[in-house]
Amino acid sequence: MTKQEQKFRERRVADRRSSSHKAIKELVQTRTEMLASYGKLASHQPFAQDGEVGVLLQKFCEALIDYTASAHFQLYRFIELEKERRGSVRQAAEQNYGKIVMTTKSILDFNDRYEDESALEEPDRLKTDLSGLGEIIARRIELEDKLIKELTASR
């Protein structure tokens, strides 16, 4: 391999790494916003049918969907499109992607149930559902962090 070819190859690798780091940064940002929104909503227990809880719930649902979409489109799609060539990253993605998809279904179900403020008519159910969702989000974050660890590891 000539020096010019080597430099070109190194530049392509650097570009791919830059793309993956950007995707990670965006994922972590949307995750942080979602977790902050979750905390604000959860701190308003016991839940009551008032405007404040409804607004917090809607903001949380929006942040939750933004986070879920960011994870899919920024991180997993990056790997799916085979822009990532490291075997350890691809292996981590294969081991965890199916589990992450299952959490996505639960997230979407929660959003569908609570996108309408009439769901506040059952505050005890919201408390239970929010607690269960918190566990699902924690599991999802663990799985994503495994992927992030591989993406940020040096060769």
Task: Name each model feature, range by range.
Residues M1-R155:
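Surface-exposed peri-terminal alpha-helical interaction modules
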